[in-house]
Amino acid sequence: ALARKATIYAEVLGGNTNSGGQRGEGTMTAPNSVAVQKCIRAALENAAIKPSEIDVINGHLTATSKDSLEILNWTKALGLSGTSFPYINSLKSMVGHCLTASGSVESVATVLQIKDGFIFPNLNCEDLHPEIADLVDSSKIPIKLIHKDIKVAIKASFGFGDVNACVIFKKFKI
C-alpha cells in the first residue's frame, strides 16, 4: 500500500476466532460466555495490546436480552468496568442486522471511526438496561456522536452457531 501510495485506513493488529461448541449456555443463537471471553483475550494477545489501550468496541450487540451478557463478557475478558471501560457501540442501531454481511459492514464502520476520528452513537438507546448500567458507566455507551481521536478499536461478532470473532484495528502511522 505504501509503495502504491494507497490510502491506508487502519492497520489490522490481530484477532481471533473460535466456537463455543453450543455447550453450556451456548446455542445456535446464543453465545457461550467462556468461549466469548477466550476469543476476546486471545485477540488482545495476538495483537499484543493491553485492554487499557482500547478506545472503542464495536460490539455484536443486537438490542436483545443477550446484550447484558455480552457486556458482562467484555468486562470479564478486559478486566475493565465503570468509567475505565472503553466506549462501546453497535452499528446495528443504525442499519439493523446485516446477517452474514454484519462482520464486514461493521468492520468498515469501525475503521471509519479510526480514520475520521469519531465514535458513532447507539441510536434509540433511550433506557439503558439496568444490568448493563451496573457494569459500565452510561457515558461509555454514547447516544450522540463523539469527536475523538481513535487509536485502537475492536470489532466483535458473536454470531449464529455460537461462532465468535474479534479483530483489532489500529490507526496507521508512517
Give names to the regions the model predicted.
Residues 1-47, 55-56, 174:
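Condensing-enzyme catalytic core mediating Claisen C-C bond formation in acyl metabolism
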Residues 7, 31-39, 49-52, 65, ...:
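Conserved active-site and cofactor/substrate-binding residues in soluble primary-metabolism enzymes
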Residues 66-81:
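Active-site-proximal gating segment of KS-fold condensing enzymes and close homologs
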Residues 50-53, 83-85:
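Short acidic capping loops at alpha-helix termini that bridge into adjacent secondary structure
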